[in-house]
């Protein structure tokens, strides 16, 4: 039997040993069991309910310069919601023309240089849904009759007609297409403008003009096709997009619109020959071609230049040496005391395509003298058209200048390009042998411009290129505004807007520009924008 003393002694001994040895943690074995019930499945359903709010529809009814607005609020529509759809009913004018000689096709000789170019400035992305019924465009006007298809009201106006020979053209202005009746397409040029300002177009915009009112969109790409039908597509949907580059500020805007056109027919206006512009430019572009593309006779050319001289214009720009122009244009110009900006037109064949023209020019100068020439222009927008490289053009300018100098010509030489060509290729003005910089700025192709701002646009382009090229010696070798064609941004072609634009250009540039052109050039195809034939302005000068 253990005595109490022995038990206590043993307990104390164990306590001592326990305190002396380390205490190890208890080992635990944890088993993780993944369970999935096979008999009790619970599924959580998550749902989102979106409230659909129908906004009112705003309807614009445009008649000439008057716009009627109606807000449509059918049953179930929230009258306080923002409208998202605009229906614009455009009531355009109907015009007919009777002429003594109107060609049935648009002809363009392969040797005839195009004197008009076009470019794109800040691009606009637009989705267009257009419903059109029997819409066509024809050139020339003898009487304007505005018919309101949706009402019983009719309005007519009868300006004095000017008889012209034209080619029929059908233009879908809403979607930027041109359906042209004829077999030949013009060399429509597209280039980018170094615009100094931008325009943000808002959704559901309608613009009314004096001649024709259209709710249209900026075409950034378009197609040209032959057509003999007077009506165009119905319920046509088109979406176009384009990107442009410029070292100046640029803007891209998008807009959507829905346009409904009913029984609309428009025409290019040609009103009375009474002066509407208060002053004349120092120079005007002239082409010695008949409306069908054939060459004018010496008598016809002499009559044209006599008219130009009577308007107080002392210089003309001629784009090429074809049509036997050295025997028709030059003699008439010498007789009338008109100076010529003689062009050497570079074609798609490259810079060597002007070699024969250079030879002909030298032969004329050595025989008749050089006094009739104001200056010589080597190429017109050849860089922009992609018909030659900058280095090739620079070399050709040097070669031509050397040959002309050896032949006795001591005048100036230049080339003519849209402003963006010099902006993208400053060597063309900084490292070439041109005596001044020639630019072709056109406000129509800048969607942020308009007829009212055409003058400031042209002046801004001159100042821009002065900075790019490091010289103040920049001259406007071609500019103008169309009287007919497709709306491009803030630019609405019409006779009234053409007069406004040209007057503003002359005011801003102190008359020192070359205006395109003497007559409407019906020998050209209308081009993608439907404007190429309608730059003629001689009748509006005093």
UniProtKB/Swiss-Prot annotation:
Subcellular localization(s) per the UniProt record: Secreted, Cell wall
Extra remark beyond the main annotation: Present with 22600 molecules/cell in log phase SD medium.
EC numbers, comma separated: 3.2.1.-
Active-site residues, record numbering mapped to chain: 478
Cited InterPro entries: Beta-glucan_modifiers, Glyco_hydro_17, Glycoside_hydrolase_SF
Originating organism: Saccharomyces cerevisiae (strain ATCC 204508 / S288c)
Signal peptide: 1-20
Keywords: Cell wall, Cell wall biogenesis/degradation, Glycosidase, Hydrolase, Secreted, Signal
Family designation: Belongs to the glycosyl hydrolase 17 family.
Main location: secreted
Start-end of Polar residues biased regions: 138-149, 182-208
Molecular-function GO terms, alphabetical: glucan endo-1,3-beta-D-glucosidase activity
Protein's UniProt name: Probable family 17 glucosidase SCW11
Enzyme class, broadest EC rank: hydrolase
Job of this protein: Involved in cell separation.
Encoding gene (name): SCW11
Superkingdom in the source lineage: Eukaryota
Record flagged with keyword RNA-binding: no
Cellular component annotations (GO), alphabetically ordered: cell periphery; cell surface; extracellular region; fungal-type cell wall
PANTHER family, per database record: FAMILY 17 GLUCOSIDASE SCW11-RELATED (PTHR16631:SF24), GLUCAN 1,3-BETA-GLUCOSIDASE (PTHR16631)
GO BP term, example: cell wall organization
Low complexity composition-biased segments: 98-118, 150-168, 209-276
Annotated spans, Disordered: 98-119, 138-169, 182-276
């Amino acid at each position: 039997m253990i005595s109490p003393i022995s038990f206590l002694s043993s307990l104390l001994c164990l306590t001592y040993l326990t305190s002396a040895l380390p205490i190890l943690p208890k080992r635990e074995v944890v088993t993780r069991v993944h369970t999935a019930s096979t008999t009790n499945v619970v599924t959580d359903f998550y749902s989102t309910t979106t409230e659909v709010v129908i906004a009112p529809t705003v309807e614009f009814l445009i008649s000439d310069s008057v716009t009627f607005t109606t807000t449509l609020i059918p049953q179930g529509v929230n009258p306080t919601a923002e409208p998202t759809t605009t229906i614009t009913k455009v009531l355009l004018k109907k015009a007919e023309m009777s002429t003594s000689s109107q060609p049935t096709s648009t002809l363009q000789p392969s040797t005839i240089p195009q004197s008009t170019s076009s470019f794109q400035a800040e691009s606009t992305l637009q989705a267009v849904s257009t419903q059109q019924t029997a819409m066509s465009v024809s050139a020339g006007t003898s009487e304007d009759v505005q018919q309101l298809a949706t009402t019983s009201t009719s309005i007519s106006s009868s300006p004095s007609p000017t008889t012209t020979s034209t080619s029929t053209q059908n233009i879908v202005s809403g979607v930027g297409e041109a359906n042209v009746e004829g077999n030949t397409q013009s060399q429509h040029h597209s280039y980018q403008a170094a615009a100094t300002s931008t325009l943000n177009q808002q959704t559901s915009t309608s613009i009314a003009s004096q001649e024709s009112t259209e709710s249209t969109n900026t075409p950034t790409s378009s197609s040209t096709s032959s057509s003999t039908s007077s009506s165009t597509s119905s319920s046509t949907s088109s979406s176009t997009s384009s990107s442009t580059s410029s070292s100046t500020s640029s803007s891209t805007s998008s807009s959507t619109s829905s346009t409904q056109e009913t029984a609309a027919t428009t025409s290019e206006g040609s009103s009375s020959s009474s002066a509407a512009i208060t002053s004349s430019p120092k120079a005007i572009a002239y082409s010695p071609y008949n409306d069908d593309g054939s060459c004018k006779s010496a008598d016809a050319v002499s009559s044209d230049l006599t008219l130009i001289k009577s308007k107080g214009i002392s210089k003309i720009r001629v784009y090429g040496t074809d049509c036997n122009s050295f025997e028709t244009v030059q003699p008439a110009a010498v007789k009338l005391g008109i100076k010529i900006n003689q062009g050497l037109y570079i074609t798609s064949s490259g810079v060597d395509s002007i070699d024969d023209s250079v030879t002909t020019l030298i032969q004329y100068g050595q025989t008749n003298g050089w006094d009739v020439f104001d200056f010589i222009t080597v190429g017109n927008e050849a860089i922009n058209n992609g018909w030659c490289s900058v280095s090739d053009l620079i070399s050709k300018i040097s070669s031509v200048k050397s040959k002309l100098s050896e032949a006795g010509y001591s005048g100036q030489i230049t080339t003519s390009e849209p402003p963006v060509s010099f902006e993208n290729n400053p060597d063309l003005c900084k490292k070439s042998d041109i005596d001044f910089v020639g630019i072709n700025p056109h406000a129509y192709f800048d969607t942020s411009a308009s007829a009212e701002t055409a003058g400031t646009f042209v002046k801004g382009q001159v100042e821009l290129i002065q900075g790019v090229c490091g010289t103040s010696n920049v001259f406007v070798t071609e500019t103008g505004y169309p009287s007919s064609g497709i709306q491009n941004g803030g630019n609405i072609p019409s006779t009234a807007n053409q007069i406004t634009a040209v007057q503003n250009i002359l005011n801003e540039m102190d008359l020192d520009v070359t205006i395109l052109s003497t007559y409407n050039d019906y020998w050209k195809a209308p081009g993608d924008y439907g404007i190429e034939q309608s730059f003629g302005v001689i009748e509006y000068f005093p």
